[in-house]
Amino acid sequence: MIVLLSSGNLAVTQAVLHRVTSSNFKSNEDSEKKELPQNLKEVADLYQAAELVGDAVREVYQHDGKALEAQGAGFQVSFLLGGQIRGEPMRLFQIYSAGNFIEATTDTPFLQIGEHKYGKPILDRVVNYRTSIQDGIKLALISMDSTLRSNLSVGMPVDLLIYQRDSLKQTMRRRIDETDPYYQNLRGYWSSALQQAYQQAPDPDWQDT
């Protein structure tokens, strides 16, 4: 099972997606890579899948990059690619607009794309390699709520997908909107908890009151 998430220019995203799902995509770099798969269904492992997406990004840049930049649009796109192929370990990659990529590790167990500066601090403080699925769901939604509150360009709904090791299928997929009872309860609880924590934090001892 392979999951591909994107952020950035929608036209570029769709062009990349077409290439990695097409049965006849061949990168200009094929001559340098033997037995390169033609689409995501043919990859032997997730690293090879990340390479394929990266090659597709560079191919789209060669085709559209200069025209986009001439119009001031820029070539901005990034992807998260994760999942598992039978017999291989689960892996997660972040692919940049240059086609290069990094992989999540035990020391850096999560990756983010898009508008993440508002929601990243809670993840940096709490998430680790042993974080449970339930805690991961809570933290992901709290992180998204922080982004939604601070950036008007980001909106609902939130699509949540859970994958468990070796299942090779979706464990759960849920679309969460503003009316979702759990999300409403969680954001209210988190807001109250932050206010309480702020009130209980010690006052500075170097300032006159």
Describe the residue ranges of each PLM region:
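A two-mode feature
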Residues: 63, 71-209
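Conserved short S/T/G-enriched processing/targeting/catalytic segments and their helical context
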Residues: 1-66, 113-120, 124, 128-131, ...
